[in-house]
Amino acid sequence: MDAIAQLNRMGCETWAAAMAMDGPGARIARHFDQINILDEPKLQAHILRHQIDAVYSTGSDLAMPVACRLSEKLGLPHFVSSETADICNHKDRMRERLTRECSGNIPYQVMDSVQQATVGFPSILKPSDSQGQRGIYLVGSQQQLESRFASARQFSRDGRVIVERYIDGPEISVNGYLVDGRLRFLAASDRVTWPEYTGLIHRHVVPARAVGRAEDSRLRDTVLDACRRVGIQNGPVYFQIKLEKGHPYIIEMTPRLDGCHMWNVLQKAAGVNLMKLVFEHLLFGRVDELQKLRAVRPMELVFWCQKPGSQMERGVFKLPRDAVEHFYYYQNGEYVRPVNGKFDKVGYYIRKL
């Protein structure tokens, strides 16, 4: 929705595609077409039929490789190759491409059937190619790994899981922006998760309190090194990182904006509208939005969540008086769609700290 709204403000004609017209983005796009985003031949025909100038996704790892492949085939603008997008969409390929020489990489093991874990415990068990925090488990023993294995693998399109050494320390989200291989923007936020749901986001706090001057320098080096290894030279990057004794370890990385509206928080906090920057850079080659960068003002984004399958009930959520913006994904009485399948986002608010 955020991307479509930005393009509408820029005067672009917007086309949205999805399997169903059941999201807020579909309602505000100039045109909506019911197309499976994985159906590349149908999408290609649609793009050619309507003479569409660019195809892009700002928040979906599943859509990124498709958008990049179509852009390569049709000569449309794109930031990264389809290979790079595919590497970032497959955690096993990402770990392999980063190599052991990357200081931010984590010991890992890929499995397509139950095996003895070699990375030690505790460890993180997750699908090799899923998004939305689906099928992620913290396991403390071989027995726990085996009991959770099938549940994690069911979310993998390739039928594989990855087991990674558990990194003990605070978790941060990192939004960056590259221009011709230079890291021109970097902002870290504390990533506060729900204690009862491993990895599921509750709050983002800007600037990250877990990042001091020493950590910031290491963080920049790690992000830039990882981008070079996987082939990201231009456009947005998003990382989930954990700091263990001040050292940054990469949990996830992807060549897109995050899916948590952090562009909105960062515009209010640091002056740069990353969503606008993405499309001005992609469509027109302009990056002057970066000149608006200023010292970061403390802010937070807080998500409201409900169990999937429940009915939206706005009245149960408290909106602070000092909130500067808020949004609900559902109307009262609408059913919450399963995304992570455990505790799904139904809205958010942003406030100054």
Task: Outline where the language-model segments fall.
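ATP-binding N-terminal substructure of ATP-dependent carboxylate-amine bond-forming enzymes
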Residues: M1-T84, D288, V296, E334-Y335, ...
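Short, hydrophobic beta-strand segments that form beta-sheet elements in well-ordered domains
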Residues: E13-M19, V55, P107-M111, S123, ...
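A conserved helix-loop-beta module that forms one wall/lid of the active-site cleft
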Residues: E72-G135, G140-Q142
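Conserved ATP-binding module of the ATP-grasp superfamily
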Residues: G104-I106, P122-L125, I136-S173, A188-S189, ...
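Peripheral (often C-terminal) accessory segments that flank ATP-dependent C-N-forming ligase machineries
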Residues: A117, L277-L353
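Protein kinase-like catalytic core scaffold
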Residues: S123, R184, Y249-E252
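ATP-dependent carboxylate/phosphate-activation module, predominantly the ATP-grasp catalytic core
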Residues: R165-I232, P236, L243, T254-L282
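Flexible, glycine/charged-enriched surface loops at secondary-structure junctions
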Residues: Q233-F239, E289-R294
